[in-house]
């Protein structure tokens, strides 16, 4: 099963739009999980997820989206048992009703990550606004800080590290990174 994770901070309308989109998509073998980075109880996000029958996880607002990803990779959240994640930020929306299948189709043997965009800006890297990864690959990833706490920690993971960016780590594992067309 694929777990689609939407990481949200304070954009309630984005989450609402996401859930409306999700209700129209092919959800075969997929479960949606919302991770809410916040420092306060915010019942409206949780209630919205309940209305759509979506798993809701609240965590401290530390480390942005990559901090939340690190917490899932390290088993620090009450997250459902998972084998494959499709990780997206709340400002990235599906453009196809079959987007889960399109990502899953790229995850053939020898592929570590399927992503929306491999960017050459700054240096070649995986844009972390939308990517799919399997648990085995995710558990091998390293981060420049544990826990990830700052925007700079996130940038180091994504594209600033000299040799340990997300993409470089996956490729050193002997795995491919594929862009979903």
What is each of the regions a protein language model found here?
Residues 82-93:
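Short beta-strand-to-loop acidic/aromatic patch adjacent to the donor-nucleotide binding site
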Residues 41-81:
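Active-site-proximal specificity loops/subdomain of glycosyltransferases
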Residues 117, 122-181:
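Catalytic core and acceptor-binding pocket of nucleotide-sugar-dependent glycosyltransferases
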Residues 22, 72, 99-107, 170:
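A short, amphipathic alpha-helix embedded in the catalytic core of nucleotide-handling enzymes
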Residues 11-25:
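Short, well-formed alpha-helical segments that are part of the catalytic scaffolds
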Residues 29-40, 57-59:
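Short beta-strand/loop segment that forms part of the nucleotide-sugar
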Residues 2-12:
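A conserved hydrophobic helix/loop-capping motif in glycosyltransferases and polysaccharide synthases
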Residues 95-122:
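Conserved donor-nucleotide/metal-binding helix-loop-beta segment in metal-dependent transferases, i.e.
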């Amino acid at each position: 099963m694929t777990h689609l994770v939407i990481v949200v901070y304070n954009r309630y309308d984005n989450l609402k739009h996401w859930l409306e989109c999700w209700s129209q998509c092919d959800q075969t073998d997929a479960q949606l999980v919302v991770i809410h980075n916040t420092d306060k109880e915010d019942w409206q996000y949780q209630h919205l997820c309940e209305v759509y029958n979506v798993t809701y996880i609240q965590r401290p607002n530390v480390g942005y989206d990559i901090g939340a990803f690190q917490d899932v990779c390290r088993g620090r959240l009450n997250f459902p048992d998972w084998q494959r994640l499709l990780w997206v930020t709340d400002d990235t929306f599906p453009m196809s009703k079959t987007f889960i299948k399109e990502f899953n189709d790229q995850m053939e043997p020898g592929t570590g990550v399927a992503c929306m965009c491999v960017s050459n800006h700054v240096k070649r890297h995986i844009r972390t606004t939308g990517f799919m990864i399997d648990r085995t690959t995710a558990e091998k990833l390293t981060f420049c800080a544990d826990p990830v706490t700052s925007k700079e920690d996130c940038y180091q993971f994504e594209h600033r590290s000299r040799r340990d960016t997300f993409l470089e780590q996956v490729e050193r594992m002997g795995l491919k990174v594929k862009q979903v067309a």
